[in-house]
Amino acid sequence: MSLSKIIPSNKKEEQKSINAIFNSIDKSEGIIFNSGAGAGKTYALIESLKYIIRNYEKSLKQHNQQIICITYTNVATKEVKERLGNTDLVLVSTIHERMWGLIKDYQKELVEIHKEKLEDEISSLKQKLEKGQGYEKFQELEEDLKGNFKKIMIENRELFFQNYSAKAAEVKKSFKILLNDYPNMLKNVGNFKRIVNAIYKLDQYSKCYENISLNKQGYKSVEYNSIYNNDQLYKMRISHDTLLDYGLKIIKKYDLLKQIIIDKYPFIFIDEYQDTDEKVILIMSYLEQYAKKIDHKIFIGYFGDTAQNIYDDGVGSEITKIHSGLKQIDKVFNRRSTKEVIEVINKIRNDSIEQISIYDDCEGGSVKFYKGTSGNVKDLIERYIYEWKITTENQLHCLVLTNKIVAEYSGFKNIYEAFKETDKYKGSNYNQLNTELLSNDLSKLGEIPKLLFNIVRLQNNLVDKTTSVIDITPKESLFDEMSIEGLRNLIKLLKQYQGKTLGEYIESISTVYSQVNDENYKKIIDWTFGFENITFELFKNHLIEKLFNNILDDDVDRATATIQKILEVDIVEYGLWYKFIMDKQEEKVIYHTYHGTKGREFDNVIIIMENAFGRNHNYFNFFFENFLHPDVLEGEKKLNFEKIKNLLYVSCSRAIKNLRVLYIDDVTDFESEIKEMFGEVYPF
């Protein structure tokens, strides 16, 4: 088995689906290209791009036109660029980078949309202050007292944030004299903070709105930067989700912009369409509709697979409801896995796409399903480390259901445990932790995880001798007018940071920041942190504000203690977390969440499975119990079944050669269904 000898008749048959894409390209006919896991979707995408270059290069260059290819991740962007080769005709990027490229030059229109966003936010904040729960003490005040209270708090913003993480008694003491006329306001410090935070936001947004209206310098353009995963609307800065909102609004509203995009980019490809935000699909639909209206040509091609839709924010099978009239082209050949793996994933998928290997030498893989207990996990892994001759060059990839296990086995258990205790990620928000702390897609990291990632990346880049100076910050203009000596001094300043823990490292940054007067140095630090005038206390309070929003008096000590845990984690552990996010782990056994393997492929895969997943205690058992008769399911149960099926399909289809599954709960009630899928169930 080497998966190298392509059967000529299969190659010829596969080419028919590729030719169908070419035919639609020539006719400017929108398509959905569905291909199962390992089918060579990227190959088909590359071939389509090459076809356009071969046949339309002269015309594209004459009309100053280009091809857009939107990928789901930066890793995919890199892969497409490498496989496509050097060309200026194709713009390959993630959706956020491309969306910004399409709209960033229309600042007048963007500022108007930003102004509308501010209006909505201002209205929402006023509503909270006037009628919201938790704001009652402010609502009880007379209008003149409300105005005076706002004035006092705005003038004492620094004092407020200095005491943000302090105990209730200390907060009351700090504001006792200032708020002498407001005896009821400090009775509940949690509500006091909630009210004041709303006042500060309202003040910032109102000033920004006014400055836009007055056409003041600094308020004439909107900025998007991929490093931040949070909006700072009052600074005219937007993040990922808001960028897509603005993109949809501006393209929907302005026909001239639609025509400019259509005429400049007559070919648009979207990779992994099933995981793409609905707003992007809407934009594409508007473009195609308008192209038909003005009788201009545009080709829009969606490449992906609805059976691999595993993210809640992806459009999935709803795509045809949003963008109608698309031609469907399916591909059934598998270019990744052995015959043994393909047979299993076909049974899991169980739809119109039944894959066969494109290769003649596709036999020789192995699939086994074990039943056991959690106590068997370590022994199973050890067995296959020996049997499969696992090394750092021939790694074993183990998929586990819980973030806790991934974090523990990957070396950053303390980071995970600390974040799990925050209000942001506990209770009903627990499932967010999977994506916002462990995602390899940086745009999906939570606001605070992304902030810590930026800091650890800076630390990593400073100690890594292979990192270029430019990689320390994307703001290349910082270095334009700097001498070599100035550059050396800047790097020397940055390398002064010391500290065994994250907290000590941040304190070190804060100390240097307060002592030096180097404008470029401060720009790099401000850019890394996302805010200015860095102090250790400000940083701690920022973490509390974001991870324990509107905490009550009784919770201040708990919040402070949890933030302290985050700060006391060894910087080396943060380095291991950084490697996990960047997919640069070097161990023999690599641990993943099920979701974290999307788009990947591995020779050797072990999947640990149980009934429960997250807060759902009847997850995979529900799927297996209904596997033979899914048609009887309706509504939420049907949607849940499809979601679980997709996740299992994605997970099992990562395997190239060897696949093992260990189910660590009792399978008696659905063992026959497992046998239908995997052939046999072996006791471990």
Curated annotation (Swiss-Prot):
Q: Does the keyword ATP-binding apply?
A: yes
Which GO cellular component terms are attached? Answer: cytosol
| MF terms in GO | 3'-5' DNA helicase activity; ATP binding; DNA binding; hydrolase activity
Chain residues that bind ATP:
S35, G36, A37, G38, A39, G40, K41, T42
Q: Which UniProt keywords apply?
A: Antiviral defense, ATP-binding, Helicase, Host-virus interaction, Hydrolase, Nucleotide-binding
- The question of whether ATP-binding is a record keyword is answered with yes
Q: What does this protein do?
A: Component of antiviral defense system Gabija type II, composed of GajA and GajB. Expression of Gabija type II in B.subtilis (strain BEST7003) confers resistance to phages phi105, and SpBeta. May be a helicase or contribute to GajA activation.
Q: Which named protein is this? A: Gabija protein GajB
